[in-house]
C-alpha cells in the first residue's frame, strides 16, 4: 500500500532523481528549484512512497508553489508567494515502473483534499500547464482547459489548465 506525505528536506535529492527520470532536461525542475520549493512551502510538496523491506521508496511526487496568478507563468515557476490564492502545480511525476496504477490521480486528489481542508490560507484554485496528450487526464480530474499557454519549454505547446477548489 502506498503512502502520500509531505516531502522532507532530506529527500530533495531523491525527488530530483525522479524528476530527471520523468522529464526531459528542458522541462524538469533543477535540484536548486526543488530544494527551494521544499524549503519555502513544505506543506504543498507531496511524495508518494511505496513500502520496501525496511523503509519506503519515493515513486511519485507533486511539486507546487503558491501564486497570485490565475495561470502558470514563468514567474510563478520561479517564485513562491506565501499569500498567493492559487496553487501552481509544476511537476506531477510517477516513476515509469509504477505508472497506470492511478497514482497520479491519487496525488492530485490528495493535494485537492489538503487545499480544501488543511492548507491555510485556503487556495481558490489549482493551476498547471499540460502537454496536449495529458489534457484529457486532467479534465477527468476536474481541470478546465483554457487553451494554449504563453509558457514555452522545449518545442511543445503547453495548455493552461485550472481547477476551482
UniProtKB/Swiss-Prot annotation:
Q: Which InterPro entries does this UniProt record tie to the protein?
A: Acyl_CoA_acyltransferase, GNAT_dom, SNAT-like
- Source organism, top-level taxon: Eukaryota
| Species per Swiss-Prot/TrEMBL record | Schizosaccharomyces pombe (strain 972 / ATCC 24843) (Fission yeast)
The record's top EC class is transferase
Q: What is the lineage of its organism?
A: Eukaryota, Fungi, Dikarya, Ascomycota, Taphrinomycotina
- What is this protein called in UniProt? Uncharacterized N-acetyltransferase C9.02c
Q: Which GO terms describe its cellular component?
A: cytoplasm
Report the EC code(s) recorded for this entry. 2.3.1.-
Q: Which UniProt keywords apply?
A: Acyltransferase, Transferase
Query: Which protein family is it in?
Result: Belongs to the acetyltransferase family.
Q: Which residue ranges does the record assign to the N-acetyltransferase domain? A: 2-165
Amino acid at each position: 500500500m502506498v503512502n502520500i506525505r509531505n516531502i522532507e528536506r532530506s529527500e530533495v535529492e531523491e525527488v530530483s532523481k525522479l524528476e530527471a527520470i520523468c522529464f526531459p532536461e528542458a522541462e524538469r525542475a533543477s535540484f536548486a528549484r526543488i530544494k527551494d520549493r521544499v524549503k519555502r512551502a513544505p506543506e504543498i510538496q507531496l511524495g508518494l512512497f511505496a513500502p520496501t523491506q525496511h523503509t519506503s521508496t519515493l515513486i511519485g511526487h507533486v511539486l507546487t508553489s503558491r501564486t497570485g496568478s490565475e495561470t502558470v507563468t514563468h514567474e510563478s515557476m520561479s517564485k513562491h508567494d506565501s499569500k498567493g490564492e492559487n496553487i501552481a502545480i509544476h511537476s506531477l511525476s510517477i516513476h515509469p515502473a509504477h505508472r497506470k496504477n492511478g497514482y497520479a490521480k491519487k496525488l492530485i486528489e490528495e493535494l485537492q483534499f489538503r487545499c480544501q481542508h488543511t492548507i491555510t490560507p485556503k487556495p481558490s484554485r489549482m493551476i498547471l500547464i499540460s502537454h496536449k496528450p495529458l489534457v484529457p487526464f486532467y479534465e477527468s480530474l476536474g481541470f478546465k482547459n483554457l487553451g494554449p499557454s504563453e509558457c514555452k519549454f522545449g518545442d511543445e505547446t503547453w495548455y493552461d489548465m485550472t481547477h476551482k477548489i
